Amino acid sequence: MNTDDVLAVFREAGAILEGHFILTSGLRSPVFLQKARVFMHADKTEKLCKALAEKIRAADLGPIDYVVGPAIGGLIPSYETSRHLGVPSVWVERENGVFRLRRFDVPKGARVVIVEDIVTTGLSIRETIDCMKDLGIEVVAAACIVDRSAGKADVGTRLISLAEYEVPAYPADKLPPELAAIPAVKPGSRNI
């Protein structure tokens, strides 16, 4: 599965939106990938996550003990990808603004892959890595359905992406006039 195939799945689901969006990262963009419209369809989710699992396997990372997903956006893709890898899925969630592994016991030294939905700046993955390091858990790689940065985001580890789709993103004070003229909406989940 390549970038065009992934974007075709997003288009079929009506998940590529155009307008003025405030991304989870705080950056502004004329395009928003509304992955919830994809993930509401089990067949589309399975197709994408099975392909991501195959790409993770092909990366020859050695044994993987767990897949870790940052809540909220990483929950569905991490679970479905773990199913195809045949390993347990756990997740981190925010507690006082910091990712914590609250509901699971993952042993020190466990080897994990972090699976995220969409990467723009890599912040959620970096924060998940910090949480894992604090627990003595080894992050062998991160993976995502779509890398909006096209490989430019520093996620703090190797990033395996099913699709690279570079979409412009701007700080709020550096918007092009055509984007500034459109009212902004914030569809992300960072502060939920």
Swiss-Prot record:
Cofactor: Mg(2+)
Pfam families: Pribosyltran
Keywords, sorted A to Z: Glycosyltransferase, Magnesium, Pyrimidine biosynthesis, Transferase
Residues annotated to bind 5-phospho-alpha-D-ribose 1-diphosphate: E116, D117, I118, V119, T120, T121, G122, L123, S124
CDD domains: PRTases_typeI (cd06223)
PROSITE patterns cross-referenced by the UniProt entry: PUR_PYR_PR_TRANSFER
Pathway the protein contributes to: Pyrimidine metabolism; UMP biosynthesis via de novo pathway; UMP from orotate: step 1/2
InterPro entries: OPRT, Orotate_PRibTrfase_bac, PRibTrfase_dom, PRTase-like
Enzyme nomenclature, EC number: 2.4.2.10
Keyword Transferase: yes
GO terms for MF: magnesium ion binding; orotate phosphoribosyltransferase activity
Annotated orotate binding sites: T120, R148
Catalytic reaction(s) noted: orotidine 5'-phosphate + diphosphate = orotate + 5-phospho-alpha-D-ribose 1-diphosphate
Principal EC category: transferase
Subunit note: Homodimer.
Function, as annotated: Catalyzes the transfer of a ribosyl phosphate group from 5-phosphoribose 1-diphosphate to orotate, leading to the formation of orotidine monophosphate (OMP).
Family named by the database record: Belongs to the purine/pyrimidine phosphoribosyltransferase family. PyrE subfamily.
Cited NCBIfam families: pyrE_Therm (TIGR01367)
Protein name, entry field: Orotate phosphoribosyltransferase
Lineage: Bacteria, Pseudomonadati, Pseudomonadota, Alphaproteobacteria, Hyphomicrobiales
